[in-house]
């Protein structure tokens, strides 16, 4: 009897050891691609994105999911990747979800605000959520990220402060009212496993209802309204996956994969209706401001994934004007009142009375400028509003960008072939589509574009490559098949 009681303990210890093995042994491996400009793409079935508003920047992405990001004199810079879904399944229907990451900071300087963690959306109800486990700035995001502080809770063995907002403004479903949820880790960590589902569970206990999952992505961002952000954020290990898996890679789906009907990494993501605008960013509730001198500079929008209301960097730390940042990633602007914008959005180009994020005519740091402000009304490719130049977040794209004027429902941009982030040249899917709910013969020829080891290769609603460059395609559940040895 005692022996039988010991077995679960030993198994738990073994699982924990495996789950953290990447913290000591992880290193880049596989094929690699180096990007020196803004780019959304895939490598070995893993989706990736590099975006910056200025500076001399680069990023190297590997087919094993790892990546290394270098920025010099940037105003705002981000790397991100993860899973996309079709908003038809709840988190419980999809399965337990986690994200593994290892972060190595090198020569980081002049960072005013930063977020490293998990970001995404749900529908029915419409929710924008944020799990922050680390940051490249000297200080973590503060109470100004939310207008309702639920308090501190132990989630997956660590203390997180949970915030909630109710916002009216741009979202993946257009200009509307939606919820924003935040979990901010009280002690940053450079390596570990984020139990995404555990945060969902805690939020549900607090009455913070989750809807049908639209995405879950790993995000790393650094910015400063004064510019000059420099350093390297190296991620020798990064994966988002469904199921228990382990740190060594058992059953993880590569970042960018799309179980539950979503598109494969970097391919066609569910597109939203025309006219969808990017969700307003991380502005604090009206009247709630962080200390002066910590605001992002006018016209500078943080990269996508960070447009949570209330999450604005302290005054003086606004991103520079004219920065086209990706939807959803605005640095939290520490300004309270919304200004006079018709819909209350801080990040759009409709406000006429000083909204910090958009459309205001009186010096709003985030909008109304005519020279490329990513958040409002610019005519030169602003990702957030009415741009005509293919901005991933703007209203002129034709592929369904949920953030603006897209025609096909893509949550992130007007791409023509499914680029999840925008109407840019990266949108066309490169992978041959496999029949939904049926995986093609394993290791069959797919034009040389087969999924990598641990990549998605089939499942209900999946339309990406169905062959494996290594191993064979095995069903995990009806929505997700994966290349495994």
Curated annotation (Swiss-Prot):
Residues 1-19 form the signal peptide. One of its GO terms (biological process) is xylan catabolic process. Residues 449-484 form the CBM1 domain. Residues 250-450 are annotated as: Disordered. One of its GO terms (cellular component) is extracellular region. It comes from the Eukaryota. It catalyses: Endohydrolysis of (1->4)-beta-D-xylosidic linkages in xylans. Its EC number is 3.2.1.8. InterPro entries: CBD_sf (IPR035971), Cellulose-bd_dom_fun (IPR000254), ConA-like_dom_sf (IPR013320), GH11/12 (IPR013319), GH11_AS_1 (IPR018208), GH11_dom (IPR033123), Glyco_hydro_11 (IPR001137). Residues 34-234 form the GH11 domain. Residues 355-425 have a biased composition (Gly residues). One of its GO terms (molecular function) is endo-1,4-beta-xylanase activity. Keywords: Carbohydrate metabolism, Glycoprotein, Glycosidase, Hydrolase, Polysaccharide degradation, Repeat, Secreted, Signal, Xylan degradation. Pathway: Glycan degradation; xylan degradation. Residues 353-425 are annotated as: 8 X 9 AA tandem repeats of G-G-[SN]-P-W-G-G-N-Q. This is Endo-1,4-beta-xylanase C. The lineage of its organism: Eukaryota, Fungi, Fungi incertae sedis, Chytridiomycota, Chytridiomycota incertae sedis.
């Amino acid at each position: 009897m005692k022996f039988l009681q010991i077995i679960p303990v030993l198994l738990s210890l073994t699982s924990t050891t495996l789950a953290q093995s990447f913290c000591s042994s992880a290193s880049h491996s596989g094929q690699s691609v180096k990007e020196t400009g803004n780019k959304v793409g895939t490598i070995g079935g893993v989706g990736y994105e590099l975006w910056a508003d200025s500076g001399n920047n680069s990023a190297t992405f590997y087919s094993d999911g790892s990546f290394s990001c270098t920025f010099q004199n940037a105003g705002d810079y981000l790397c991100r990747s993860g899973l996309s879904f079709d908003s038809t399944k709840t988190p419980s229907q999809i399965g337990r979800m986690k994200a593994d990451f290892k972060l190595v900071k090198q020569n980081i300087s002049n960072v005013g605000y930063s977020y490293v963690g998990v970001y995404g959306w749900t529908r029915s109800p419409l929710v924008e959520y944020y799990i922050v486990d680390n940051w490249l700035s000297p200080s973590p995001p503060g109470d100004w990220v939310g207008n309702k502080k639920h308090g501190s809770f132990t989630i997956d063995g660590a203390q997180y402060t949970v915030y909630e907002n109710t916002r009216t403004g741009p979202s993946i479903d257009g200009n509307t009212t939606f919820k924003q949820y935040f979990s901010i880790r009280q002690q940053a960590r450079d390596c570990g496993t984020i139990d995404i589902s555990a945060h969902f569970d805690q939020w549900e206990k607090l009455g913070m209802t989750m809807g049908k999952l639209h995405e879950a992505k790993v995000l790393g961002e650094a910015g400063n309204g004064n510019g000059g952000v420099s350093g390297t954020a190296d991620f020798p290990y990064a994966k988002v996956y469904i199921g228990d898996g382990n740190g060594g890679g058992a059953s993880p789906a590569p970042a960018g994969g799309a179980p539950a009907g979503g598109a494969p990494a970097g391919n066609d993501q569910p597109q939203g209706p025309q006219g969808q605008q990017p969700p307003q960013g991380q502005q604090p509730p009206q009247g709630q401001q962080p200390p002066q001198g910590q605001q992002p500079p006018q016209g500078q929008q943080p990269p996508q994934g960070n447009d949570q209301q209330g999450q604005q960097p302290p005054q003086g730390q606004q991103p520079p004007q004219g920065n086209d940042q990706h939807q959803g990633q605005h640095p939290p602007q520490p300004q309270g009142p919304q200004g006079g914008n018709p819909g209350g959005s801080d990040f759009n180009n409709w406000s006429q009375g000083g909204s910090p994020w958009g459309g205001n005519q009186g010096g709003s740091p985030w909008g109304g400028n005519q020279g490329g402000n990513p958040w409002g009304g610019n005519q030169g490719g602003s990702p957030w509003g009415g741009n005509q130049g293919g901005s991933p977040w703007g209203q002129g794209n034709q592929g369904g960008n949920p953030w603006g004027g897209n025609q096909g429902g893509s949550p992130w941009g007007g791409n023509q072939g499914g680029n999840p982030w925008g109407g840019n040249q990266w949108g066309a899917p490169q992978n041959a589509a496999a029949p939904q709910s049926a995986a093609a013969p394993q290791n069959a020829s797919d034009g040389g574009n087969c999924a990598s080891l641990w990549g998605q290769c089939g499942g209900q609603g999946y339309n990406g490559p169905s062959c494996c460059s290594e191993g064979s395609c095995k069903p995990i559940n009806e929505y997700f098949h994966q290349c495994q040895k």
